[in-house]
Design a protein with these regions (language model features):
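Terminal targeting segments of Actinobacterial cell-envelope proteins
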Residues: 1-5
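Solvent-exposed, non-transmembrane regions of membrane-associated and secreted proteins
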Residues: 6-196, 200-254
Length: 254
């Protein structure tokens, strides 16, 4: 005589094995989905709260007035960032000499009304990438998006600047900077911050060793951003892949 429930008892371990296997199989996809949603929410919040330079309708004058340039938002913050960029250029980036230096933001960035310490948004149409951008390449910032290396220029544009922006070559199932090495000469890279959107074009790519600091330093007279990620893919970071981008001439105003 067969005992009741015997077949069910035999199926339970198989069901558990199936569910565990399914969870493992779906983990990268689900993680990528939720990472993308989190980044998307941060970007949406940034664009929804960034100053536009225009006043609400109820504050606009009833009589027409002559057109004027909109006021610069947070002028004291902008001046602080510009001064930092001048300082590191003039001292030759002497403190760009360790991992700890790249993790430390040169300027504590926190603006009322903005989400945490998010600085802006990096957009690369050629690889359909849009990510939050932070100052200081800490582990937390790198998990949340792309991050400017401390002791390199802050990405607001200007002569004698080179903002080095790092991103994981894939992280927790999401691509991050995985496809950055596929960029071609002439591809566009845009950095949106509270003061505008400087536009850049890819002018050079190269592979360097992790300790090649000179390759990421400011180049006198130029307005650059340099994208940096590990290379080869899934190698544990044996080398670094650089994508060097220069400000488009019509945009090079600051």
């Amino acid at each position: 005589m067969h005992r009741k429930g015997g077949h069910k008892g035999n199926l339970l371990p198989l069901l558990l094995v199936f569910l565990v296997g399914l969870a493992i199989f779906l983990y990268p996809t689900l993680n990528s989905y939720f990472t993308g949603k989190r980044m998307g929410s941060s970007i949406e919040f940034f664009f929804g709260t960034a100053p536009t330079g225009t006043a609400p309708d109820d504050l606009l004058p009833t009589e027409p007035i002559a057109e004027t340039e909109p006021p610069t938002p947070y002028p004291e913050v902008l001046e602080l960032l510009e001064q930092y960029n001048r300082d590191i250029y003039e001292d030759g980036q002497v403190r760009l000499n360790s991992l700890a230096a790249t993790e430390q933001a040169g300027v504590l960035f926190c603006v009322s009304g903005q989400q945490g310490d998010m600085f802006g948004v990096i957009s690369i149409p050629g690889i359909e990438l849009e990510m939050p951008l932070y100052l200081g390449a800490t582990e937390a910032h790198m998990a949340e998006g792309a991050a400017q290396l401390g002791q390199t220029s802050i990405p607001i544009g200007g002569e004698n600047t080179n903002a080095v922006i790092a991103g994981h070559r894939g992280y927790n199932g999401a691509p991050y900077f995985r496809y950055v090495p596929e960029l071609q000469i002439g591809d566009s890279v845009n950095i949106t911050n509270l003061w505008g959107t400087p536009h850049y074009r890819v002018v050079e790519t190269k592979i360097i060793q992790p300790n090649d600091i000179d390759a990421i330093k400011i180049q006198p007279g130029r307005d650059l951003i340099t994208l940096l990620t590990c290379h080869p893919y899934a190698s544990g970071g044996k080398q670094r892949f650089l994508v060097i981008c220069e400000r488009m001439e019509e945009e090079n105003g600051r």
